[in-house]
Every structure is written in structure tokens, then in C-alpha cells.
Amino acid sequence: MGESDLRIDPLTGAHVIVTPWRQHRPNLPDGHCPFCPGGLEAPEPYDVRFFPNRWPGLPTGRAEVVLHSPQHDASFSSMDPDAAARVVELWSARTAALGARPDVDYVFVFENKGRLIGATIDHPHSQILGFGLVPPIPGTELAQPTCDLCRNPDDELIVTRHSKWLATVPWAPSWPYETLIAPRDHVADLPTAGPASRHGLAVILAECIVRLDALFGPGTPYMLWIHQRPTDGDEWPTAHLHLHLAPVMRSPGAVRHLSSAELGAGMLFNSVDPSQAAAELRKLGEGA
């Protein structure tokens, strides 16, 4: 199953979904925040909420927005554990609902936080896409003969542990201070993780964002995305649920930009040693 607007570059094999309708979306909302209670997308009071994206990256109801909190200035780092867990629970519920559709083979949860990332609305929210195929990067991970996430990571790359979850800096991170959060058990996706495990994910995610805010300042801009088992009905035995948390800063006050050499050659350059990044993030949690 594919995407009707998907094009594959004949030179590189890059996947591009053409979405001309998104050119008409507003850069910034006019007047009141549409995500605050009483706003355009949230006419009634709520704790967490989802709705179809008005300017979807994918058509036919396969693009959703998830509101994390009714508070306009809330964040994972400021929420109490139960509030953060409600967001993860909604991610899980929507993964199951979208994944049950015959036209969805992969459910992709992500968050772009901050204007530096391109977020046009400050209110805390994430998005979910239901792809009609398995995207290339998750597909590459899933094609590995064994599950790398089931191996014990180097101690020097560990940032923190919580319950059944482990947060590490990847051995070859694409972004300085990127963190990978994964369950210690081989769990395939959010729905099968179970409520207690999903609560643990919310706690360790919030803790990792607190560390980023301590390093870069409050409201650190970041990208977040989740890789999990496809929903196409195949077994996918190597699927191991995990979350990437990538701040776009390389140091306080300095943004990490992708260069033409990186985009053109497909070779990334990371100016921060992964073990040093892990040590800094680890130290920021001491005594917390």
C-alpha cells in the first residue's frame, strides 16, 4: 500500500510526498490561540485532546494533532507525571485506532517544539501521521537481522534509568545531545507496552527534557519522534519501541544547522562527543 502523492527521487531513492495544499496554511494564528480551551480546535474543556489536522501532511484523515494540556505554557518538563502520562496514553490509543485502518501501515508520532523547529503555534502539541507504507528510516531499522536495542549500551552513554526504561545518547547521534529512550524489554509498540510501562515512558521523557532545559535554558527547542512496529499485519520480530529526543542546539545559545555537505553527501558531522554529551546530561540530574 502506498501514498498517492508519493514520489521517489530516481537519483537518490529519497521519498517525497507532494502536499501543495499545505502552502495555504497560515504561518501564525490570528488572535487567540486555537488550541486553548474555547479556541477553534478546542471548543470544550479538556485534559488531552486530538483532532484531524486542518493542513495535513497526509490526506483522508491520516494526520492528527494531539493537544498535551489546556495550559498554553505547559511542557513535558512542567507537567506532573500523571498529566504527561495522559499524553502518552493518547499517543497509544491513536496508534491503535489509526493502525487498525486498512490504508495505514505505519503510525508515526512526533513533536516539533519551538519556533526554531518551525512550530507556528506555541501551545504544547504533537502530531501523528498514518503512513500507507513503512517509511525508509524505520524500514532500515526493521530490516536489521537482530535487535540492537536489546544489547546493553556502553555505561558511558547512559543518561538515566527509570523503571523499565533506559535513556542513552546514541553511539552515532545525528544531533548533539540527542537522546534515545527505549524499554529494557523487547516491546514492539505503544499499545502492547501496557499502562504501567507507558507511564514510565512519560516520566523518563519529562526527566530528559528537564535536563535539556537545565543545559540550554527553559523551553529548549527540540524534535521528538517515535519508532514502533508497523501496522501492516506482518510479524516484524526486530521491532523495538523507542523514542528519539533531539534538541536543535549544539551549545547554549548556538543552533545546530544542517550544512550543504551533510545534506548533499549524506554524511553528518557531530561536534559533541557522544560520551561527553551523556556525561553532561547525566550530571544535570544529580541531586534532582
Predicted regions and their residues:
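Extended C-terminal subregions enriched in glycine
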Residues: A202-G217
